[in-house]
């Protein structure tokens, strides 16, 4: 309100309506039973709060150090085995382990247990396409499940060979997957 010549003038701010709809789309996935398997790679601990920015940096450092000649990075393995809510997890840049090869210094092997995995395809440039699907899995898909629940503290990213795409893993058609272990409720 403003006073003009002793009288009050009223101003009406226009009403704005904001509507936000979430969900309402079909998440593509398949259930796949996989035997246990062993991966080899480099492992580092991260905070969930900073993971979205620091894990892409971990990948960048991996290749800058020349570690891509040992492990090209077929998998990104999120390991939170105790699932204790500590706010941290271990992340491994890994390949399937070939027992005929030596394990380079600074690398480890990790056995991934047998599970039924919900496998989600991701299409698009990294890391945004993968992070978008991952967010939908944990904020919308998992909470809405009626028949299954999260089975263990693993989340695996599987990456296609980037050399098959004109713009590598930044290509709009780049393919990757997210694997989530599930079990019947």
Annotate the PLM regions.
Residues 2-185:
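A solvent-exposed interaction/effector surface
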């Amino acid at each position: 309100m403003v006073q003009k010549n002793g009288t009050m003038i009223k101003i009406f701010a226009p009403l704005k309506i904001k509507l936000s709809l979430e969900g309402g789309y079909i998440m593509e996935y398949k259930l796949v039973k996989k035997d246990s398997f062993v991966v080899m790679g480099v492992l580092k601990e991260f905070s969930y709060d900073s993971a979205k920015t620091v894990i892409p940096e971990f990948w960048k450092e991996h290749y800058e150090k020349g570690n891509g000649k040992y492990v090209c990075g077929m998998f990104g393995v999120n390991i939170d085995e105790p699932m204790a809510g500590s706010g941290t997890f271990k992340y491994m840049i890994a390949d399937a382990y070939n027992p005929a090869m030596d394990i380079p210094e600074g690398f480890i092997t990790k056995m991934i247990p047998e599970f039924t995995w919900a496998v989600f395809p991701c299409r698009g440039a990294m890391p945004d396409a993968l992070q978008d699907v991952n967010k939908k899995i944990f904020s919308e898909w998992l909470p809405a499940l009626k028949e299954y629940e999260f089975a263990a503290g693993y989340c695996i990213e599987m990456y296609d060979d980037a050399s098959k795409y004109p713009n590598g893993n930044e290509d709009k058609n780049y393919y990757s997957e997210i694997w989530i272990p599930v079990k019947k409720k």
